[in-house]
Design a protein with these regions (language model features):
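Active-site scaffold of zinc-dependent metalloenzymes
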Residues: 1-58, 72-73, 86-89, 98
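Post-HExxH zinc-binding segment in Zn-dependent metallohydrolases
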Residues: 80-121
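Active-site recognition of the HExxH zinc-binding catalytic motif
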Residues: 60-72
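Active-site catalytic pocket residues across diverse enzymes, especially alpha/beta-hydrolases
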Residues: 74-78
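Glycine- and charge-rich intrinsically disordered segments
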Residues: 118-134
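Compositionally biased, intrinsically disordered low-complexity segments
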Residues: 51-53, 64, 124-126
């Protein structure tokens, strides 16, 4: 699913843990066995990945990853300033000034889409559980 933050195109994907691990290893470093990710924002490809193996967490994970995407889109990352150790109150206020309205709009727009995906995953899980019992 394609969407925009400012003029930057982003893609939202719902993926399995296995797919998420592959993306992590491609972009960052080898994955440690037993670890898992609920979500991942890849600024270099403008992609947000949401782990569909955890349907109950999808909404909060999307909100979290969307903030990473907003920070990347508006070049507000503290990683851009190697001397900066954390965000100040002023930094956070500037972030909300620059992209707060857009962030809130996107959260509202994606809420029904994420709910639909979550419900589809839960229905599939319920069918799998019912099949195993029979």
């Amino acid at each position: 699913m394609i969407f925009y933050i400012g003029s930057q195109e982003w893609e939202l994907k719902f993926v399995t843990q296995e797919e998420m691990n592959r993306e992590w290893e491609t972009e960052f470093e080898p994955f440690i066995d037993g670890e898992f990710l609920l979500g991942l924002t890849i600024a270099t490809t403008s992609t947000i990945l949401i782990n569909k193996d955890f349907p109950r967490r999808m909404s909060s994970v999307f909100n979290h990853e969307l903030m990473h995407a907003c920070i990347a889109s508006y070049h507000l990352s503290k990683s851009d300033d190697t001397n900066k150790k954390c965000y100040t109150e002023e930094d956070i206020c500037n972030l909300m000034e620059v992209c707060g309205d857009e962030y809130c709009r996107l959260v509202r727009e994606f809420k029904p889409i994420i709910e639909e995906e979550k419900n589809a995953v839960q229905i599939k899980e319920n069918r799998t559980t019912s099949t195993r019992r029979n």
